[in-house]
Amino acid sequence: DEIVLVGGSTRIPKIQQLVKEFFNGKEPSRGINPDEAVAYGAAVQAGVLSGDQDTGDLVLLDVCPLTLGIETVGGVMTKLIPRNTVVPTKKSQIFSTASDNQPTVTIKVYEGERPLTKDNHLLGTFDLTGIPPAPRGVPQIEVTFEIDVNGILRVTAEDKGTGNKNKITITNDQNRLTPEEIERMVNDAEKFAEEDKKLKERIDTRNELESYAYCLKNQIGDKEKLGGKLSSEDKETMEKAVEEKIEWLESHQDADIEDFKA
């Protein structure tokens, strides 16, 4: 692969140096005029759009400028379509509820490179309702991201148990970021990478502990599983311990990772 400098500003020595450093010391190719490259690309794209038969063997690929995903427990950005994915594209992933007997899930769609949604850009929100009563984590909610050739994003959420679904469509001119804002978000992700990594690890550890506590709670209450194998005294002791842990988690959202591991 070659690194090609495109655009007049790439003649600036400092920019060339930064590009070289970004690619771990690999020298950019200097055999292409950066101004001519822009003009050539624009001409080819114009030919493709106008249906010129001579451009039949040429393909210009559009890519997703920022990672797309949804918000999950703890404000985590769960990624579905990574940055620089060639479009059109489609990706699905299974999610579930965050509490027992939850009748509605809210799907918040974000773009950005940070691990928490508070640092990314909200594109849209919609609700999936009518979820039958069930323990936390049991319902199967399939979320699908689809980007067409025009860059239009369609997000669908479907309850696999009932077939109930809802969706949102986000166009290119609807609450989207400018190229300058996109560049800033990418730079921020690199700048705060180490800090974000530690924060994400703490939240993941908390979520794992919470999931384990609720799973154990459900098993204790199920006579066909752990609940049927315990004596009344042991069952009462375990139920009390689990409830205390859940209450502690709810009142210590910002505890240190060491506390969650204790």
From Swiss-Prot:
Sites of N6-methyllysine modification: K229, K235
Modified residues (N6,N6-dimethyllysine): K229
Region (Interdomain linker): 53-63
Source taxon at top rank: Eukaryota
Annotated Gene Ontology cellular component terms: cell surface; cytoplasm; cytosol; endoplasmic reticulum lumen; intracellular membrane-bounded organelle; melanosome; mitochondrion
PTM-bearing positions, type N6,N6,N6-trimethyllysine: K229
Residues with O-AMP-threonine modification: T162
Modified residues (Omega-N-methylarginine): R136
Record EC number: 3.6.4.10
Keywords for this protein: ATP-binding, Chaperone, Cytoplasm, Endoplasmic reticulum, Hydrolase, Methylation, Nucleotide-binding, Phosphoprotein
Signal peptide: none
Main location: endoplasmic reticulum
Enzyme class: hydrolase
Sites of N6-succinyllysine modification: K91
Binding residues annotated for ATP, in chain numbering: G8, S9, T10, R11
Regulation of protein activity: The chaperone activity is regulated by ATP-induced allosteric coupling of the nucleotide-binding (NBD) and substrate-binding (SBD) domains. In the ADP-bound and nucleotide-free (apo) states, the two domains have little interaction. In contrast, in the ATP-bound state the two domains are tightly coupled, which results in drastically accelerated kinetics in both binding and release of polypeptide substrates. J domain-containing co-chaperones (DNAJB9/ERdj4 or DNAJC10/ERdj5) stimulate the ATPase activity and are required for efficient substrate recognition by HSPA5/BiP.
Residue list for modification Phosphothreonine: T162
Gene3D superfamilies for this protein: 1.20.1270.10, 3.30.420.40, Substrate Binding Domain Of DNAk, Chain A, domain 1
GO-annotated biological processes: maintenance of protein localization in endoplasmic reticulum; negative regulation of IRE1-mediated unfolded protein response; negative regulation of protein-containing complex assembly; positive regulation of cell migration; post-translational protein targeting to membrane, translocation
Catalytic activities: ATP + H2O = ADP + phosphate + H(+)
Recorded domain comment: The interdomain linker regulates the chaperone activity by mediating the formation of homooligomers. Homooligomers are formed by engagement of the interdomain linker of one HSPA5/BiP molecule as a typical substrate of an adjacent HSPA5/BiP molecule. HSPA5/BiP oligomerization inactivates participating HSPA5/BiP protomers. HSPA5/BiP oligomers probably act as reservoirs to store HSPA5/BiP molecules when they are not needed by the cell. When the levels of unfolded proteins rise, cells can rapidly break up these oligomers to make active monomers.
Function in brief: Endoplasmic reticulum chaperone that plays a key role in protein folding and quality control in the endoplasmic reticulum lumen. Involved in the correct folding of proteins and degradation of misfolded proteins via its interaction with DNAJC10/ERdj5, probably to facilitate the release of DNAJC10/ERdj5 from its substrate. Acts as a key repressor of the EIF2AK3/PERK and ERN1/IRE1-mediated unfolded protein response (UPR).
Subunit structure of this chain's protein: Monomer and homooligomer; homooligomerization via the interdomain linker inactivates the chaperone activity and acts as a storage of HSPA5/BiP molecules. Interacts with DNAJC1 (via J domain). Component of an EIF2 complex at least composed of CELF1/CUGBP1, CALR, CALR3, EIF2S1, EIF2S2, HSP90B1 and HSPA5. Part of a large chaperone multiprotein complex comprising DNAJB11, HSP90B1, HSPA5, HYOU, PDIA2, PDIA4, PDIA6, PPIB, SDF2L1, UGGT1 and very small amounts of ERP29, but not, or at very low levels, CALR nor CANX. Interacts with TMEM132A and TRIM21.
Family: Belongs to the heat shock protein 70 family.
Name by which UniProt lists this protein: Endoplasmic reticulum chaperone BiP
Organism: Sus scrofa (Pig)
Gene name of this polypeptide: HSPA5
